[in-house]
Amino acid sequence: VFKLFNFWTGKRMDKDFLTDERGFQNTINEITDCFKFIRADQRYSSNQILDIADKYKADGLLIDPFNSLTTESSNKHQEDYDTCANIRIFCDTTNTTTFVNAHLVTQAARNVFPKDHEYEGNLRPGEKADTEGGQKFANRADDFWSIHRMTQHPQLWSTTEVHVRKVKETITGGSTTQRDSPILMKWENHCRYTINGKNPLINSYSDVGDKNKSNLGQTSLQHKSMSKMSYPAPEDDLPF
C-alpha cells in the first residue's frame, strides 16, 4: 500500500503527510475504495482468484506472480494452457482487464550484455520465450510486455524499460516498441515516473500533503509504525 499511496499522490507517504492527517486518511479511503487486496497469507488456484474478482465485479485484476498459484494437476504444461484459456474467457465474459506477472527462467537471468557493449555485464531484457513456462503465455495473451531494469547500472538503475513485445489489436493505433527502443520510465523520489521528462499523471493528483516543510522531523501516530524498509537507507562506507 505504501508504494501505491506514493504513486497515487505523487508524494512521499513517509515525508509529505506528517501533519496532513486528513489528506492521509482521505487518500487511504480513495485507495481502498478503488482496490481490493487479496490476502497473501495463503495460496490460491487460478479459479479461486477469478471467482474473487467476479464476486467483487472488478474492472481489472492483477495476478502477481503467476508461479504463486497452486497447481491442480500433475501436467503443469497443460494446466498453464488451461489457466490462460480460462483467464481469456473470464476477460471476455466479465469485461475485466487482467494482467499476469511472470518471472524469467533461470537461463534468461544469466543473459548479460557482452564484452565491449555499452551495457557490458548488465542483464539483458527478457524476450517472450524467456518467461517461466515459455512462449505459451505470449501465445495466449492479447498483449505482452517485458519490464526490465538494470539494477546494478551506476546511472540507469532507476530507469525502467517497457518493451512492448506483442499487441494483438493494432488497427486502433497500438503497436510494439522497436527493437532496443523501449519506453523509458524514470523513477523519481520513490513516488513518480516520468517519460521523456513528462509525468503523465501530473493532472490526476489531489491537493494533499504537507505544505510546510519545517515539520519534516516530526512523526504523526499513523507513521510511527511504518516500515522503514520501503525506502533505501542512507549510503555509508560499510561494505555490507
Across the structure, where does each feature detected by a protein language model lie?
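Short acidic/His/Gly/Ser-rich catalytic and metal-binding motifs that mark active-site loops
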Residues: 1-2, 69-72, 107-112
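Helical mechanochemical/support elements of P-loop NTPase systems and associated helical scaffolds
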Residues: 20-27, 42-48, 76-86, 127-133, ...
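Phosphate-binding/switch loop-helix module in NTP-utilizing enzymes
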Residues: 36-93
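C-terminal regions of RecA-like/P-loop NTPase motor modules
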Residues: 10-11, 15, 46-58, 92-94, ...
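Structural recognition of the conserved hydrophobic beta-strand(s) that form the central parallel beta-sheet
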Residues: 62-63, 96-103
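Active-site-proximal loop/turn and secondary-structure-junction residues that shape catalytic pockets
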Residues: 6, 43, 67, 104-105
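Cytosolic-facing regulatory segments adjacent to core modules
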Residues: 1-56
